[in-house]
Amino acid sequence: YLYFLMREIKKHNFSKVFDLQNSSRTNFYKNILFPKAGKEIWSSSATTLPAGKNKSEFDKNSVLERFEYQLKDSGLSTLNTLRPDFNWAATDISEIKNFYKITKYILLFPFCSPHLTIKKWPYYNKLIDLISSKYGEEYKVITAPGPTEISEAKNINALALLDNGRALDISQLTALIKDSSFVVANDTGPAHIAAHVGAKGLTLFGKHTTA
């Protein structure tokens, strides 16, 4: 996997990389791709550290504050960095809502990438039972599986929303999250969307969290 990834990246001859993950993994990539590169080629929290600060000190700032500093240091506009708003991506999903007859709903994202199963919380069906026993028909419990998650969604006791048998696209998904009453998600993309459209919710970080 790593060999093919590195070969693919090298093929494009990128002149600059903005590393916003700032993890040990992406630092490993840097050491393979651009071992001697400074911030002119590889922009990361490590290469753009403010004078007199070490990385552990710098990492005490919020993620968005670190992003702002890193991007500003590379000469990019950061007007919206501290106030990310993804609402612009939402599209009209009234037809889908009408088809499934949903108005008030709690949205679950029990899925994760196949290679990151450690992020998966295994108690969603128990949670659905608790929600149903407390709220009855007041809220529908739904999920929105991605293209590779449609089959897996059958194991979750929630209504799986699709668009004519296909997974919702990013704009439809954003609208669904935005209009939800509450979101419960693993640490995946939809959780980040929820945070940036102002949705109420909870992110679960693996199976160590009990129901």
Question: What are the roles of these predicted feature ranges?
Answer:
Residues 1-211:
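Catalytic machinery of carbohydrate-active enzymes
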